[in-house]
Regions:
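Structural preference for solvent-exposed beta-strand-turn elements
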Residues: 1-371
Length: 371
């Protein structure tokens, strides 16, 4: 193989496909990047962990076709320090050679024929999304998914489309985040996308600047195409929790309206104290009393007491909540709007939403009140 490529474009493409790669000591070859140079200047880079695959195409000058599989970390680090606009990549005698105007470096390669054969796409008609909108919807919900793979049914983000509405939901059983929006698609679909795929997809969407993304789904796979990059992933085929039932079961008889920006500042200050609380990490006590919201927290060596004026409907209440959980949601709201918090009792789930947006909801379970 012998190719000439734009260094920055090659580095950008490499960074896209590496998002699918995880260290694999049993099969080291899938810890590497697959590179193939085809006719007419078509160059393919691919990364996979066998459940998630990212493939990206770029243009270059192909002087000799060929394939290579290489460990990407050192190559990426080296390319960042080079100043040449164009570089040559040559595979020769079991080495990947990178040539610049004044240097030459050699990297070990693996046998490309041993790299798993993975298809690039799936059949069917694609759904077209706004790239920016899809990235935003996934970003605003993924934090609610369980990060543990012990229960795959919640280690994912749920996407449902019906009646020209798209719903994106995530839960870890302690909290639930729900977001919906309009979509120009007549059909319906329900799919649970693994959290690792969602995180890689968001990074890919943020890296590229195409206007739209194409989305396809079949029985056990999802496929996204953004420009010259493609993401192919398995789906979670376990039942997703009944989020509609959960949302309907949340009732309240108290309401708080508070300035989002000021409340965020309060929570961030309190979080400094409670993030290492040995008894209950991130736990703080929230007391609603006559139009004031008091927030207190302790660490091993210090304590904090804050309060903020709010608009209150209903009786006073005291409740223990996870400060980090609140910030995870509130950071995605417009700081100029007011935050609405609906409550019932100290033992009941709370619901949060933007005062101007009923389509983005957050439900969080309280913690045990401690003296």
């Amino acid at each position: 193989m012998n190719i000439k490529v734009d260094r920055q474009e090659f580095l950008k493409t490499l960074r896209i496909v590496e998002k699918a790669i995880a260290e694999n000591k049993i099969r080291p070859i899938i810890s590497c990047v697959y590179l193939e140079a085809q006719e007419e200047g078509k160059i393919i880079l691919r990364g996979t962990n066998l459940e998630l695959t990212i493939t990206s195409f770029m243009d270059g000058e192909v002087q000799q076709k060929g394939k290579a599989v290489f460990s990407y970390q050192l190559v990426e680090e080296y390319l960042k320090e080079i100043t040449d606009k164009e570089i040559n990549l040559v595979v020769k005698e079991g080495l990947l050679i990178i040539e610049t105007s004044d240097s030459s470096s050699e990297f070990s390669v693996m046998e490309p024929e041993e790299y798993p054969r993975i298809k690039d796409s799936i059949e069917g008609t694609g759904i077209v999304f706004s790239r920016e909108k899809l990235a935003e919807m996934l970003e605003k919900t993924k934090f609610g998914a369980s990060s543990s793979t012990d229960n795959l049914s919640i280690n994912c983000v749920r996407v449902e489309i019906e009646d020209k509405r798209i719903k994106v939901v995530a839960t870890d059983t302690y909290r639930l985040v729900y977001l919906e929006d309009d979509i120009e698609y007549e059909g319906s679909l329900k799919v649970s996308i693994p959290l690792t795929t969602v995180e890689a997809l968001i990074k890919t969407l943020r890296t590229l600047d195409e206007e739209n993304v194409e989305f396809k789904f079949e029985e056990n796979q999802v496929f996204f195409r953004v420009g010259s990059s493609m993401v192919l992933s398995r789906v979670i085929d376990l039942p997703f929790p009944d989020y509609n039932g959960i949302m309907k079961s949340v009732s309240h008889n108290k309401k708080i309206s508070v300035n989002t920006e000021e409340f965020t500042k309060v929570l961030k200050r309190v979080q400094i104290f409670v993030k290492n609380n040995s008894e209950s990490k991130y736990s703080a006590i929230f007391s609603l009393e006559a139009g004031s919201f008091y927030v207190s927290g302790v660490s091993e060596t210090a304590k904090v007491n804050e309060h903020i004026e709010v608009e209150q409907e209903g009786d006073d209440v005291k409740i223990s909540l996870n400060v980090k959980f609140l910030l995870d949601y509130i950071q995605h709201l417009d700081k100029n709007d007011r935050l609405i918090i609906d409550l019932l009792t100290s033992n009941s789930a709370i619901q949060l939403k933007n005062s101007k947006d009923e389509k983005y909801l957050y439900i969080a379970m309280p913690l045990a009140l401690r003296d």
